């Protein structure tokens, strides 16, 4: 799956920028990395930095960048008077294994909070739920070891994979949230999945209206997390 990238707001930085920064740093050294990242930084105390670690649902597949979930969530939270900057660390097609592998680079601009929104592609590929659970377990443990506050966004298994698979997969998120004492948003696509008017023609990726529904339902969890932490 390919990600379209059209308009970018002045204060919203997609994950691709961090990847490019890392490649430049390998060539020119750590000073190159600092030079690329600092112009996008917000002075300490001005904004709470949140990373949204996910797949195409986060990246904004098929959407202009300003209509991606992180961008719209940032706008919504700012309209509520919350000083936040949300970094889009979504990579189309990514699995929990991919998210774990790139975790260090996703955190290159150090956040205080991370929304973990991975697992949709694990389900689509019928990956063993035990592996998905282990990857997410390691991601959350790593984030907590860095003192980062976590919101885990749950996913559900595709219905065509059978009851046994769905039962095992769907239990991953509440179990991990309880194990690590982190906040849980039960289902990232709540109110959007299988609703034609809220999805693109592929029936899998939310359109701009679908993203609005996600923001409306997800944002209270984020606001609660920010107020209490």
Task: List each language-model region with its residue ranges.
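Bacterial N-terminal signal peptides that target proteins for export
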Residues: 3-30
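Bacterial N-terminal signal peptides
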Residues: 28-40
């Amino acid at each position: 799956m390919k990600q379209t990238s059209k308009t970018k707001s002045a204060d919203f930085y997609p994950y691709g920028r961090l990847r490019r920064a890392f490649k430049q740093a390998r060539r020119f050294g750590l000073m190159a990395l600092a030079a690329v990242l600092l112009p996008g930084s917000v002075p300490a105390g001005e904004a709470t930095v949140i990373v949204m670690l996910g797949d195409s649902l986060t990246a904004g597949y098929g959407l202009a960048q300003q209509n991606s979930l992180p961008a719209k969530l940032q706008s919504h939270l700012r309209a509520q008077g919350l000083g936040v900057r949300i970094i889009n660390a979504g990579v189309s097609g990514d699995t929990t294994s991919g998210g774990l592998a790139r975790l260090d680079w996703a955190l290159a601009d150090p956040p205080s909070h991370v929304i973990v929104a991975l697992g949709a592609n694990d389900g689509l590929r019928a990956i063993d739920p035990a592996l998905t659970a282990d990857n997410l377990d390691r991601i959350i443990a790593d984030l907590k070891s860095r003192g980062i506050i976590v919101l885990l966004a749950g996913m559900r298994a595709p219905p065509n994979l059978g009851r046994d698979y769905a039962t095992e997969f769907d239990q991953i998120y509440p179990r991990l949230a309880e194990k690590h004492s982190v906040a849980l948003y039960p289902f990232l696509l709540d109110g959007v999945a299988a609703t034609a008017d809220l999805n693109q023609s592929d029936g899998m990726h939310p359109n701009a209206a679908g993203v609005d529904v996600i923001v409306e339902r997800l944002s209270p969890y984020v606001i609660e997390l920010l107020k209490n932490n």
